[in-house]
């Protein structure tokens, strides 16, 4: 299969939405019957985002094969059916790590290692490997043209453009076309300078996607075309919209996909965007609304919970309700208690690491349990629900996770290597997909207990979901917690690890060790989120009635 490559760059300012634009174009091409994948090349020195602060970088998106990647890969999976993997995202740090490792092994036979050709060759190899087996591979270059960090990536795609030829490569550049209120006009000069910068390093853009708060008039498009040496029909206006899921139709209406198909000399069907039209209709025509309190520790940057935010919206689409998310700092819950949890239709406690704010999350789980308020716990959200139940229902006063209190008298949650069995020995359990010894990453099978809310929601005896955690439920406390009324509704593939818990006599008190948000999409939703939002809407209606 001959793969065609679309390289997406950005200029003028950051945060223009390259990832959304790339994913939207991919969605149109997929709707035309093409097999499409998307890659993200990140210029930072970190090897991967796994240890980066969520408040600086946003969430870490976990792929099926266990790669910790940029949140843009979440956008890609929500827009197209292709599943991402570790080949879809790599960083400067990863490239340098691999090149230096090869140099230490002597793979370069004593050659002087340089950015060109060794680093650029390594980048090109990864791009070509990532696109293998697909009709079209869209490659997003992180950062902004002009950044020193991006230069090796830009040089690499310049070389690929030359080596593969025009019939297999296309360069798409996103720029900002601002409207100056004082002057009352659109300004194209920033775009002209950005294209000049790009051309100075040997890349001539074939398509310009011009971002702004309004549509660009035809005369301004003609001006941009003239000064940037781009066909007028290849100057695409991408104005701000109230829903990112409108963007595929917006790009389609301006013929961007036709331009790509013609450039690559492909023969394919017209785009069928009916699924996206249905999503937009559902979003625009809700029958009600719910307010969900998200109790977390990274709430100053909503992108830290990007996939959770989107999954809640998807569940709203399926239930025909608008989901309003109220972000609540778990430390504020510690300070003010019930006061900040009033007026909610449901509580969601997402994943997280570290001790800060954990007692606030435990309090939120207790509040939901005692008030029959729908509760959904994810990863740490399941662990705090378990800790709360152990303390206040099962009589295990002082129960905790060894992550937060290594001296707890009742370690109901701990590292899998920390369990002490009845003989007093340290018990070690792991699954073949464990990485790094203690972190469970990637998609794994879960067995669901018949008749539970989890099994009913999935309408299946099993599910496959993605993990990202180090700590597990301590199996030594399962019997005692079950006798107190807790239901362990999900077990790992070997049935040795707890994956889900729930309360039977509660409208919706369900929690999972895995991260279901990573597999939710606007077209398909996700069973657990849909069940949670349905229960939250029913709770609200009960109050009204």
UniProtKB/Swiss-Prot annotation:
Stored InterPro entries: Class_I_gatase-like, CTP_synthase, CTP_synthase_N, GATASE, GATase1_CTP_Synthase, P-loop_NTPase
GO cellular component, one term: cytosol
Activity regulation summary: Allosterically activated by GTP, when glutamine is the substrate; GTP has no effect on the reaction when ammonia is the substrate. The allosteric effector GTP functions by stabilizing the protein conformation that binds the tetrahedral intermediate(s) formed during glutamine hydrolysis. Inhibited by the product CTP, via allosteric rather than competitive inhibition.
One GO-annotated biological process of the protein: pyrimidine nucleobase biosynthetic process
Matching Pfam families: CTP_synth_N, GATase
UniProt keyword Ligase present: yes
Active-site residues, as the UniProt record annotates them: 379 (nucleophile), 515, 517
Subunit architecture: Homotetramer.
NCBIfam families assigned: PRK05380.1 (NF003792), PyrG (TIGR00337)
Protein's recorded name: CTP synthase
Annotated organism of origin: Shewanella frigidimarina (strain NCIMB 400)
Lineage: Bacteria, Pseudomonadati, Pseudomonadota, Gammaproteobacteria, Alteromonadales
């Amino acid at each position: 299969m001959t793969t065609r490559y679309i390289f997406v760059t950005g200029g003028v300012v950051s945060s223009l939405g390259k990832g959304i634009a790339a994913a939207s174009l991919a969605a149109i091409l997929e709707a035309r019957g093409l097999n499409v994948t998307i890659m993200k090349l990140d210029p930072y020195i970190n090897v991967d985002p796994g240890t980066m602060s969520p408040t600086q970088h946003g969430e870490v998106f976990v792929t099926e094969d266990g790669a910790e990647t940029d949140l843009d890969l979440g956008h890609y999976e929500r827009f197209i059916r292709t599943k991402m993997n570790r080949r879809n995202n790599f960083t400067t740090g990863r490239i340098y790590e691999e090149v230096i490792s090869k140099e230490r092994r002597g793979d370069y036979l004593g050659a002087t290692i340089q950015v060109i050709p060794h680093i650029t060759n390594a980048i090109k190899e990864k791009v070509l490997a990532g696109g293998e087996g697909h009709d079209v591979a869209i490659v997003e270059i992180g950062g902004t043209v002009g950044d020193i960090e991006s230069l090796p990536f830009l040089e690499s795609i310049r070389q690929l453009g030359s080596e593969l030829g025009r019939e297999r490569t296309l360069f798409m550049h996103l720029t900002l076309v601002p409207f100056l209120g004082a002057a009352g006009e659109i300004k194209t000069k920033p775009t002209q300078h950005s294209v000049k910068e790009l051309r100075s390093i040997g890349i001539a853009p074939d398509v310009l996607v011009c971002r702004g708060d309004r549509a660009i008039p035809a005369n301004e498009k003609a001006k941009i075309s003239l000064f940037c040496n781009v066909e007028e029909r290849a100057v695409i206006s991408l104005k701000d919209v109230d829903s990112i899921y409108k963007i595929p139709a917006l790009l389609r209406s301006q013929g961007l996909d036709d331009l790509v198909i013609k450039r690559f000399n492909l023969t394919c069907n017209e785009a069928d965007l009916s699924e996206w039209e249905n999503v937009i209709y559902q979003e625009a025509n809700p029958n009600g609304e719910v307010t969900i309190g998200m109790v977390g520790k990274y709430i100053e940057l909503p992108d830290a919970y990007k996939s959770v935010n989107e999954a809640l919206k998807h569940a709203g689409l399926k239930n025909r309700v608008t989901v309003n998310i109220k972000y609540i700092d778990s430390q504020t819950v510690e300070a003010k208690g019930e006061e900040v949890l009033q007026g909610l239709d449901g509580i969601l406690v997402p994943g997280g690491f570290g001790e800060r704010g954990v007692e606030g999350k435990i309090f939120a789980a207790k509040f939901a349990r005692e008030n029959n308020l729908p509760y959904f716990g994810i990863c740490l959200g399941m662990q705090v629900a378990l800790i709360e139940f152990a303390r206040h229902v099962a009589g295990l006063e002082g129960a905790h996770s060894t992550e937060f209190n290594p001296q707890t008298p009742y370690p109901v949650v701990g590292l899998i290597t920390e369990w002490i069995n009845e003989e007093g020995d340290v018990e070690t359990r792991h699954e073949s997909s464990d990485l790094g010894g203690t972190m469970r990453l990637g998609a794994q099978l879960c067995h669901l207990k018949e008749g539970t809310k989890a099994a009913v929601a999935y309408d299946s005896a099993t599910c496959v979901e993605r993990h990202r955690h180090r700590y597990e439920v301590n199996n030594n406390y399962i019997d005692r917690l079950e006798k107190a009324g807790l239901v362990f509704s999900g077990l790992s593939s070997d049935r040795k690890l707890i994956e889900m818990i729930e309360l039977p006599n509660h409208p919706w008190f369900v929690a999972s060790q895995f991260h279901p948000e990573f597999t939710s999409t606007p077209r398909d939703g996700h069973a657990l989120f849909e069940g949670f939002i349905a229960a939250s809407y029913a709770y609200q209606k009960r109050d009204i009635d």
